[in-house]
């Protein structure tokens, strides 16, 4: 198996344009890993799928195409907000700060509880890097990992192990 060395950003050397989903480093454009992976799959045609599901069956039996598209957009927005809150909570938790008064949605609370009961207890976490940016100069690829953490051999894995988490908020 070939090993590809990936660099990790420790400063602001990598910039990300969220709207265009493009990374730049030293004025060079890098393809996001998400964009790269999309090349291997057919594009999801939300309009056509919503049209087909409208007034069909199950949870869509009483929904129009527009209502379905709105529902999907709301779920995407909710997922983005959950990611933001979990990221903020992790940054605060590992820097001994307080979270504040902002209420957390149920899925963010579930992510927090999962972290506290499954990750911290089982893996003996040392370092945590939420929204960790990585890149490869030769391939001009870059991406952001939802959270990476270093843990030791007292847990389920070997010493100096790093694990990566990709938060999902779907059912």
Task: Map each language-model feature to its residues.
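Charged, glycine-rich intrinsically disordered N-terminal tails and low-complexity linkers that flank
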Residues: 1-81
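Catalytic cores of nuclease domains that cleave nucleic-acid phosphodiester backbones
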Residues: 2-15, 20, 67-164, 170-171
């Amino acid at each position: 198996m070939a090993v590809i060395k990936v660099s990790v950003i420790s400063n602001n050397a990598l910039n990300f344009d969220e709207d265009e989903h493009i990374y730049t480093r030293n004025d060079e454009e890098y393809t996001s890993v998400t964009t790269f992976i999309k090349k291997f799959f057919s594009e999801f045609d939300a309009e056509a799928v919503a049209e087909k599901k409208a007034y069909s069956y199950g949870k869509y039996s009483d929904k129009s195409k527009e209502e379905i598209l709105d529902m999907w957009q709301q779920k995407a927005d909710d997922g983005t907000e959950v990611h933001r809150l979990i990221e903020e909570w992790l940054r605060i938790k590992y820097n001994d700060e307080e979270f504040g008064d902002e209420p957390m949605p149920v899925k963010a609370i579930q992510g927090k509880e999962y972290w506290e009961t499954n990750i911290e207890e089982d893996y003996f976490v040392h370092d945590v890097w939420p929204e960790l940016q990585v890149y490869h100069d030769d391939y001009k690829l870059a991406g952001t990992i939802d959270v990476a953490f270093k843990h030791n051999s007292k847990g389920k894995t070997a010493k100096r192990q790093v694990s990566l988490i990709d938060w999902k908020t779907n059912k």
